[in-house]
Amino acid sequence: MDSATRNPNYSPEVDPQPLPSTNPIHSRPIFSFPKRPALRITTEFDSESTVFFHKISCKFLDSLAKLKFAFHNNSKGEIAEPQISFVSKYLSLHYDLEDHSALVKSSVDVGPKLKLIGTHDVKAQQGEVTMVANLDDPGYALQLSTPLPSIALPKATFKFPQGEISLQEINDHDEDEQVKNSLSVSGTLKGQLLKGLCTAQYKDQEFKLRYRYKDDEMSFLPILSLPSNALSFAFKRRFGPSDKLSYWYNCDSNYWSAVYKHTYGEDFKFKAGYDSEVRLGWASLWVGDEGGKAKTAPMKMKVQFMLQVPQDDIKSSVLMFRVKKRWDI
């Protein structure tokens, strides 16, 4: 019989364990240096303009703000349009080193449903102040904006789920060079009609009617402008998950254009088309998402090759390319 069975008060001997140190000096290094923020370098090149565009940026303050430096340089190495930017959620500053001009943008949440947005050009001494008030019902908002220095009443825009309406005072000059104030009305109204979306837009005394029908294989978009009675329409047909044909025609000018697109996975795209207005045929190949960023492309690099063939002078065909590369350091 073992000792635990003979003596109910028996407890085995346990080696003593060292107690954890409560002195904070021994729990962290004597000298601690802040972690260097990650640098993001992006370079773009366009063979048509033979100009490089460079951008260097980094985030700091736990990604609450970003510092960016951007500039162009040509084939001779000359630097042009250098700009420094500081961007955060509530304040951004863009400074042009050549023009010595600064653009300041700021936004302040006055309340849970009220926001103030301000923009100021320091060199031009001009700016704009906008107030946005979100109403209790979702999708409804009232926006007031005025330029600084103010020369007219603020522009008022009322937004609702079916569109928006804007009222703005405009200062015109008559034949006697006297200032004449007038009220300008613009707006957009949209709604469902015959399994499609109908949109009516009025701006600058021009009225546009759009109707868009779209399903999994086809989309159709006619556009009518009044009072010019200009009519155009766009048609798109999908032949599978990788092939799509787009066609656009203007009934007044008889100009038309067509584009065929074929995708190879997510990173390769081939497009070919023709534009009758400029009498130009073209074809392009994209490596990387055409509308995406370089960080999602293979090797963080996007490349586009484009061949342009003029109909009237085939011998003057041009092959161009664009490259965009990103480095994370």
UniProtKB/Swiss-Prot annotation:
Protein family: Belongs to the plastid outer envelope porin OEP37 (TC 1.B.47) family.
Function according to Swiss-Prot or TrEMBL: Voltage-dependent peptide-sensitive high conductance rectifying cation channel with a strong affinity for TIC32 that is imported into the chloroplast. Conductance is pH-dependent decreasing with decreasing pH values.
Residue ranges that the UniProt entry lists as topological domain Chloroplast intermembrane: 71-87, 122-138, 164-205, 227, 254-255, 283-302
One Gene Ontology MF term: monoatomic ion channel activity
Record keywords, A-Z: Chloroplast, Ion transport, Membrane, Plastid, Plastid outer membrane, Porin, Transit peptide, Transmembrane, Transmembrane beta strand, Transport
A Gene Ontology biological process term: monoatomic cation transport
Main subcellular localisation: plastid
An annotated GO cellular component: chloroplast outer membrane
Keyword flag Ion transport: yes
Quaternary structure and interacting proteins, as annotated: Forms an hourglass-shaped multimeric complex.
Biased composition (Polar residues): 1-10
Transmembrane domains' residue ranges: 61-70, 88-97, 114-121, 139-148, 155-163, 206-214, 217-226, 228-236, 244-253, 256-265, 273-282, 303-312
Annotated membrane topology: Multi-pass membrane protein
Domain of life (superkingdom): Eukaryota
Subcellular location: Plastid, Chloroplast outer membrane
Organelle targeting sequence: 1-57
Region annotation (Disordered) ranges: 1-29
Cytoplasmic side: 58-60, 98-113, 149-154, 215-216, 237-243, 266-272, 313-329
Record's protein name: Outer envelope pore protein 37, chloroplastic
